[in-house]
């Protein structure tokens, strides 16, 4: 979440790796249950597995080897233990070629539709058990889901402390002074080019006491445009919501994103409506109904897809 990569790696030797959640990078307000952080661990594992195959190695992955996780995760216990084993029979993954290309694109997408055969290719990207993947490009569906996503963003940032946590990791000048390599800047938010410069101008010339409110309005307007420009939406659901489910959802998401990159598609997660914030429950239930997901299942990821002229 927010490009903070909330994990750390312990290399026991050249072939043994332990993956941990990094408690210094967890978002206590944006991601209160560390669900997104576990999904992020899944994306790391999938990337490692793909890269290992390219090197002729088989990745033997054991999730939560120390104990079955219940409730909050103990940062001292590994999320995964990974052993890399040389294997002449391992098959390389064509998605390896897109590891460095794949990135989250938060710009406004074009009006170009996604061909149905591309959607089918994306749907075939999933390979994790107990995980379902869905897509829809139907106009009325997109309009209704866009409304829920935008309303969810308003609920998310109605909490001042939660918005402050967001601003700490998103460098919007002149508000954010965060200079570390994690998070992302204004251009990666989708505020790039002349339009982005003009959008940020009121923040630059306004008194400091007004800037957070102006930034909130700017981010909400941008989120609405982002959602409304989606050529399609995709989602990943699991039957439960155990930590294993969350990691598997992350692996599925990474394969979908890499496959999208290979097809020239842009992708952006839009997951606020999935979070257990106060006031979000009704929107989440309506999204479940819209997606056709039973309330005994959990939507782990929700994302928009489309084509973009910008690399942001």
Residue ranges: model-predicted function:
Residues 1-312:
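Acidic, surface-exposed loops and disordered segments
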């Amino acid at each position: 979440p927010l490009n903070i990569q909330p994990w750390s790696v312990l290399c026991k030797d050249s072939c043994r790796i332990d993956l941990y959640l990094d408690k210094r990078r967890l978002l206590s307000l944006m991601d209160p249950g560390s669900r997104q952080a576990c999904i992020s661990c899944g994306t790391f594992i999938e990337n490692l597995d793909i890269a290992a195959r390219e090197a002729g190695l088989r990745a033997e992955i054991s999730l939560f080897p120390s104990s079955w996780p219940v409730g909050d995760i103990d940062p001292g216990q590994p999320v995964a233990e990974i052993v890399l084993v040389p294997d002449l029979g391992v098959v390389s993954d064509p998605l390896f070629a897109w590891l460095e290309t794949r990135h989250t694109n938060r710009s406004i997408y074009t009006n170009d539709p996604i061909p149905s055969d591309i959607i089918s290719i994306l749907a075939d990207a999933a390979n994790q058990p107990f995980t379902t993947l869905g897509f829809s490009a139907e106009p009325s569906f997109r309009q209704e889901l866009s409304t829920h996503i935008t309303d969810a963003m308003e609920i998310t940032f109605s909490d001042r402390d939660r918005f402050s946590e967001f601003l700490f990791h998103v460098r919007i000048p002149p508000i954010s002074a965060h200079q570390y390599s994690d998070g992302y800047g204004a251009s990666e938010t989708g505020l790039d080019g002349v339009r982005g410069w003009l959008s940020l101008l009121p923040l630059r010339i306004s008194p400091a006491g007004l800037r957070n409110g102006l930034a909130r309005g700017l981010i909400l307007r941008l989120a609405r445009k982002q959602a409304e420009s989606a050529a399609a939406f995709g989602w990943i659901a699991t039957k439960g919501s155990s930590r294993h489910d969350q990691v598997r959802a992350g692996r599925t998401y990474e394969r979908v994103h890499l496959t999208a990159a290979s097809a020239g598609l842009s992708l952006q997660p839009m997951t606020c409506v999935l979070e257990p914030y106060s006031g979000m429950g009704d929107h989440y239930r309506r999204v479940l109904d819209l997606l056709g997901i039973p309330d005994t299942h959990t939507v782990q990821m929700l994302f928009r897809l489309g084509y973009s002229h910008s690399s942001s």
